[in-house]
Amino acid sequence: DKESSKEDQAYAEKLLKSVGSQAGKLQVSVSPVSRQPYKVWPAQHFAKLSDWLIESQGAQLYFLYGPGEEHFIESVKKEMNNDPMPDVGIPDLLQTRALLGKMDIHFGNDNGLRHLAIAAGIPTLGIFGKPSAVSWTPPGPTQHRSVEYDPGCKQSCTYPECEHLSCIRDVPVDEVHQALKKLLNDHVL
């Protein structure tokens, strides 16, 4: 990440070292958070893919979130069979951008952390509910990918009256898994 200040980069390096980050291991940031229910993919799905990253890729996983969003992380951790890296807390935005610049890949819900990961220049995979992925995924380079599902009502969505939120809850785990594998193979491994 060439755009972060030397101070922010030093902070990120010190933070990663303090939680046991190991050079040569796949570094993955995961953000299963959003304050909008139509952007929250189920915790058990994040847990399944997080376990896969740890077990089959030897990844070191860092859950990132903002103030008041810890409960999203705890919900995912409860469903996991493996331990992610220790919590890195809530750095400020510039420190978070520097931290993301140290990651190999980012995956998560459509949220601000994904935008920071894109700005940090790392490959991203976004999981989209109500908003159209094409509106929020940078055009061109394939290092930023997205997965979405349309149950037939995305264009005419009546949220908050919508009670099923199928557009995010039913995004297929296997489809996200395949997109994550392809992104890793194309840009990281």
Predicted regions and their residues:
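Mid-sequence helix-capping/hinge segment at a functional interface
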Residues: D1-Y38
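Electropositive phosphate-/nucleotide-binding environments in soluble metabolic enzymes
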Residues: K6, A43, D170-D174
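A short acidic, often aromatic-flanked loop/helix-cap motif at beta-alpha or helix-coil junctions
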Residues: S5-K6, D92-T96, G152-Q155
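Flexible, glycine-rich phosphate/dinucleotide-binding loops
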Residues: Q36-P37, E70-H71, A133-V134, C153
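Structured loop/turn residues at beta-strand edges in well-structured enzyme cores
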Residues: A23, G101, T142
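Nucleotide-sugar donor-binding patch of glycosyltransferase catalytic domains
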Residues: D87, H115-L189
